[in-house]
């Protein structure tokens, strides 16, 4: 009788817990996170008047969360989601789960270096590391007061061999050394928006060592001219996304750069906002990269006229275009083809976004009303013509 009573008190259902399979018992016991059953739950399993016994320690977590391979996949999934959402600190919550999750998360964090504070970057550079880190992603975000010596000191602890993405957002006073980029042959993405030090000489020296580069972001790098872009186009054949938009020194980027990119790489996204691109350059772009182009930014391109954008859209030279930016183009007045193109894409169920300034938006609305009236009047004219032909 006492043996049966002991079995009942120690049975899993007596505490309201799921039964752990025998094969998983060893793995659960070996888990570093083994919380004990609350006392009130354990006491509820005994009969009234019997001595209260403490329930044995049992794991509340599922056995799959103790498998390192599965934990690594989960942590990487969280890392990818936090990167897309722009919340790099979301991954830090995984550090607090248990020892296994902490170890896996630290390994993933060592592959992704993100700094939004210059003081923390200096602390990282001054800390004693056990060997060099080999991350895949290095991001510096809005470190406007960061000095070049601080960046050089930090990069001494970062090996470039496994580097895939290097992004320095609004870090105007620092520049990755050309020698460092020379050892980053696997780099896929280089983003230096708002950098005042990027020049043609830097691009000419660096692009030779970046044959696998796919994305180049040089927004607001107003010292770059056609010469630097031509060098990048001829040395980076896998390039598919280029952004050269700027507010100053637009005359340094002309149709020469656009033609070089069109002839040497297969562009999918091109941003030349504020550049002196002409109608001829846009025609060359459409002739070579028209089918592959998906996003095109032409804001503040003052030399474009009705002979390029409307005519090319009328000919469906960009069949897969989904984003078209046309703000502040003073010589663009005929927007009928633009409106028809947008209506055709919507009728086909294809996503399309055509952005314009206030003037162009007003022209779009007027042209849409005109087309609506013409479409409504067309059946009436056809019916009247049919009736007249029947009377004759």
From Swiss-Prot:
Main location, first listed in the record: cytoplasm
SMART domains xref list: LRR_CC
Compartments it resides in: Cytoplasm; Nucleus
Top-level taxon: Eukaryota
Keyword Nucleus: yes
Alphabetical keyword list: Cell cycle, Cell division, Cytoplasm, Mitosis, Nucleus
Family statement drawn from the similarity comment of this UniProt entry: Belongs to the AMN1 family.
Protein's recorded name: Antagonist of mitotic exit network protein 1
Species in which this protein is naturally found: Eremothecium gossypii (strain ATCC 10895 / CBS 109.51 / FGSC 9923 / NRRL Y-1056) (Yeast)
Underlying gene: AMN1
